[in-house]
Regions:
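Local sequence-structure signature of Cys/Sec-based thiol-disulfide redox active-site neighborhoods
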Residues: 73-107
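Conserved acetyl-CoA-binding loop-helix of GNAT-fold acetyltransferases
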Residues: 1-14
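C-terminal "cap" of GNAT-fold acetyltransferases
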Residues: 52-74
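Conserved catalytic-core motifs of GNAT/GCN5-like acyltransferases
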Residues: 25-26, 37, 41-58, 142
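Conserved GNAT acetyl-CoA-binding A-motif
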Residues: 14-32
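Non-catalytic, surface beta->alpha helical segment in thiol-disulfide oxidoreductase systems
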Residues: 138-157
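Thiol-based oxidoreductase modules, predominantly thioredoxin-like and allied folds used
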Residues: 110-122
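Structural micro-motif
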Residues: 127-136
Length: 157
């Protein structure tokens, strides 16, 4: 299927470009938008680090340093107690949802913070393992599910 074509392309492309390997994130439990471990293991990926239910898998092409999660991602916490969303534009719907949530928060006088991850440095220093969308409330990571106004309202009530 398409997954096989994509992973084989990624592996070949990375090797052709002289990369050290490829990493991906999986979960011990089935979660939305996260690949299945068995699929990647079939291509030689191995677990190299863990945070809670999440595992970092790597397919290394050489003997370079084994990838690890950054220390700041291990806590999955932030100092801010307001609802805070870290996001990037990996998904084409993200900006739409950010705009919808911004409008909803204004209309309902709710404090919500958006922190856009738009550089490698910001991604490396993110307070969790997700850099495409991460929801924090009262300082704690609560999910990586992209929210719209309706799902946000259910979460905060």
């Amino acid at each position: 299927g398409i997954g096989k074509e994509l992973i084989e392309y990624a592996i070949n492309d990375s090797k052709e470009k002289g990369k050290s390997g490829i990493c991906t994130l999986v979960s011990k439990k089935k979660k939305p938008f996260i690949g299945e471990k068995k699929f990647f293991e079939h291509y030689g990926f191995k677990a190299v680090d863990t945070i809670g239910d999440y595992e970092l898998l790597a397919l290394q092409f050489d003997d370079s340093e084994t990838p690890r999660f950054n220390d700041n991602a291990r806590t999955m916490k932030i100092d801010n107690q307001d609802f805070t969303i870290y996001y990037s534009n990996e998904c084409p719907y993200v900006e739409y949802e950010v705009n919808e949530l911004t409008e909803y928060a204004k209309e309902n006088n709710i404090k919500i913070n958006f922190i856009k991850i738009d550089s490698l440095e910001k991604a490396k220093n993110a307070p969790c393992i997700f850099n495409n969308w991460a929801n924090f409330y009262k300082g704690k990571f609560i999910s990586n599910t992209i929210l719209n106004a309706n799902s946000f309202e259910k979460l905060i009530k």
